[in-house]
Regions:
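Transmembrane-helix bundle of Major Facilitator Superfamily
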Residues: 1-191, 367, 438-442
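Intrinsic disorder in cytosolic terminal tails and internal cytosolic loops
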Residues: 1-11, 198-212, 473-492
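12-transmembrane solute porter fold
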Residues: 12-28, 33-35, 271-479
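Hydrophobic/aromatic residues in alpha-helical transmembrane segments
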Residues: 33-36, 56, 69, 107, ...
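Membrane-helix interface/capping residues of multi-pass secondary transporters
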Residues: 48, 78, 102, 133, ...
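Alpha-helical transmembrane segments of multi-pass secondary-active solute transporters
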Residues: 51-52, 81, 139, 173-177, ...
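A residue-level signal for alpha-helical anchor/packing sites in multi-pass solute transporters
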Residues: 126, 130, 160, 192, ...
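Hydrophobic transmembrane-helix bundles of small-molecule transporters
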Residues: 164, 168-291, 299
């Protein structure tokens, strides 16, 4: 299906560099925070539950605003929303770095999540907007390279800053390291993003519409319903050790989801376009890609948590050692993502299938290393090699899947569609961490750490096998023509 094609913007590679700089900063902040948590707890004399919200608050606010922010960028201007999100994020990072208490730190992290939720979907939407064909796949490949590099250097950088600053100042430096990068990104965005950064919506006659109609076009009811749904899905898994009542949120989330779907169908029958046109789920590659993304992130985030738990709690290594174990894998991920971007036009979904298969192989080999270490004393550092399979596979799955999933989505919904994929990733991550860690600790308590870690990795392998089945089905499925003339219309 042909999308809206425009003459390539001569600034598009500079625009991409701005987008990737901001995304690099956000990923550094995510990968660095786990190393900083013990210092935060010591420095602010915080309880375990309070420290958990340093992670959970950011993840929740990020996931809740993603789709609404993506749609706002589609309507009002992606460049302006990207800069706005970066300003919010940078100011919140300053507040986090100087937070006098754990409560203030959690508030700042919550606001950082909102800022990240604003600018992340704009990045995906702008890649869709300014790149086409093979160039788009290459741009997403660079996106994956940045992910790999950020994940690789985040934990060692965090360890270095904490060592330099000590337990009181070190964790603050891990927050403030975002600030100069954020300021640089804002300046570069103001220079390179096309103007106007934001635009007013216009009616069929080309006249600007008023504030109330603009608000109505943003579908505030749909935004609220979907935001509450995401919140009620993610929160129980983040607070799984808390009160039993939180699990009542899951059936409530199912009800809210049904209401949201009905509302979006209603919005499509009105002159106002819905926040998410549900017809995009009729696109096979998008629908299957969303499932692949959710299942993949169900498992992949937990891998490195399990590695850290196994190396520190079972083997007695330091946090720095456990962080360095994954460094070669992250570097390989950056290279494989770049390679995949340059070959996606020819390889297509088969690249994703290969990546998933390689990851399953790496996980099974990792289980083998654990067993050999337990039985025969084989060095645990062989896991560096087996995890390289996992790292390389990430570059073959994440960015290629994103590019393939969004390939047929009309440009008018590029930001919202990309945000739907990212929301699936966030939900997959929160549910996966809770489930896989619960399995790991339950088996560990019944047997020992080696058996528990192996059970965790095998659970992830099972999730990846389900991901593989979806990817194979998507590759073999027939492409059916879908009438998308309605959702391709510019909103007004």
């Amino acid at each position: 299906m042909q999308q809206n094609q425009t003459t390539p913007d001569p600034q598009r590679w500079r625009i991409l560099s701005v987008l990737l700089t901001g995304i690099f900063m956000a990923l550094i902040a995510v990968s660095i925070i786990n190393v900083a948590l013990p210092s935060i707890q010591t420095g602010l004399e915080a309880r375990d539950a309070d420290v958990q919200w340093v992670l959970s608050g950011y993840a929740l606010s990020f996931g809740v605003v993603l789709v609404a922010a993506g749609r706002a960028g589609d309507l009002l201007g992606r460049g302006g929303l990207y800069i706005l999100g970066m300003v919010i994020y940078t100011l919140a990072a300053i507040a986090a770095g100087f937070a006098p208490s754990i409560e203030m730190l959690n508030v700042a992290r919550f606001v950082m999540g909102i800022g990240a939720g604003f600018f992340n979907p704009q990045g995906v939407g702008m890649i869709q907007q300014y790149f086409n064909g093979r160039e788009r796949a290459i741009a997403f490949g660079y996106f994956g390279t940045v992910v790999g590099v950020a994940v690789a250097i985040g934990p060692p950088l965090g360890g270095l800053l904490i060592r330099l600053g000590g337990p009181d100042l070190g964790w603050r430096l891990t927050m403030l390291v975002n600030v100069p990068v954020g300021i640089l990104t804002i300046i570069l965005g103001l220079i390179f993003f096309p103007r106007p950064y934001l635009r007013r919506l216009r009616n069929a006659d080309g006249k600007p519409i008023g504030l109330l109609r603009t608000i109505r076009a943003l579908d505030p009811v749909g935004s609220l319903l979907l935001g509450l749904t995401v919140l009620m899905v993610m929160l129980p898994f983040m607070e799984s050790r808390g009160s039993a009542w939180v699990w009542a949120m899951l059936p409530a989330a199912a009800v809210l989801l049904a209401v949201w779907l009905k509302w979006e169908k209603h919005m499509k029958s009105t002159p106002t376009a819905p926040m998410v046109d549900l017809d995009i789920f009729r696109l096979r590659h998008f629908r299957n890609g969303a499932i692949i993304a959710t299942l993949w992130f169900f498992g992949t985030t937990s891998i490195w948590v399990l590695v850290a738990q196994y190396y520190q709690n079972a083997l007695g290594h330091s946090a720095l050692v456990s962080g360095l174990i994954g460094l070669p894998a992250a570097v390989l991920s950056s290279f494989s993502a770049n390679w995949a971007g340059h070959h996606l036009d020819k390889g297509g979904r088969r690249i994703v299938i290969s990546g998933i298969a390689i990851s399953i192989t790496g996980l099974l080999l990792t289980v083998g290393v654990i067993a050999l270490h337990s039985k025969f004393g084989v060095s645990e550092y062989w896991m560096i090699l087996t995890l390289c399979f996992v790292g390389a596979s990430g570059g073959l799955v994440i960015s290629p899947n994103q590019a393939l999933s969004l390939r047929d989505v009309p440009l008018t919904y590029a930001g919202a569609a990309g945000a739907v994929l990212q929301t699936g990733q966030r939900i997959g991550t929160s549910v996966g961490l809770a489930v896989i860690l619960a399995v790991t600790f339950a088996v560990k308590d019944a047997f020992n750490w080696e058996v528990g870690a192996a059970a965790g990795f095998l659970t992830i392998s099972t999730a990846f096998f389900a991901t593989l089945l979806v990817a194979v089905a998507d590759d073999r499925g027939d492409t059916k023509a879908v009438n998308l003339s309605r959702i391709a219309e510019p909103p007004h």
